[in-house]
Amino acid sequence: MTNNLTLICDSVEYNGYPHANIKINDSIVYSGIVDDCKNKFDIPIPSGAGMHTLSIQRYGKTEKNISSDCEQILKVNGILIDGVAVPKHILVDNSKFEFNHIVNHGSLDFYPNGTWIFCFQTPFITWCMDQKISHDAKFNNNYLLPWSYQLGPNQADQLIYDIDQLFEKLEVIHD
């Protein structure tokens, strides 16, 4: 069984469209021009638990593709895994663009030649929820329990209190 990843790109043409090698787990799934006609890529990914890497190696940009007012650009507009959009904050938190020994974390626009890398894990929904918990924990100390991602501030404490009250009632009934 395989899962499906859909990569949606955009490009800005200037004396030609950007060229790219698109890889999943170091296997090339597309090599060529990314333009208005070819900007959506359906990529099968192996199912089962494991880490995966989507990479886009941009190449072929020269001085002819740059001017003072315009430049050739390649952009990642979105990624869907099994039809579910990867939230932008997860894309930004788990991606980087490397060029000329420089690493830019969270960049979704590629101006120079270089390699963009997005690391993710399957099963995707579990990994996505873990990423949401980690992201929310940066801004809210109340997200301490793994299942509390769907609870708002202080709701985990209230839920624990309600459960304790139910146990007390059960003890009274049992005695």
Where are these regions (language model features)?
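Short edge beta-strand/loop segments characteristic of extracellular beta-sandwich folds
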Residues: 6-10
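Activation corresponds to long, low-complexity, non-globular regions
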Residues: 1-3, 13-15, 86-175
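Beta-strand-rich ligand-recognition modules
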Residues: 11-76, 87-117
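Extended extracellular/luminal ectodomain segments enriched in beta-structured repeat modules
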Residues: 1-5, 49-51
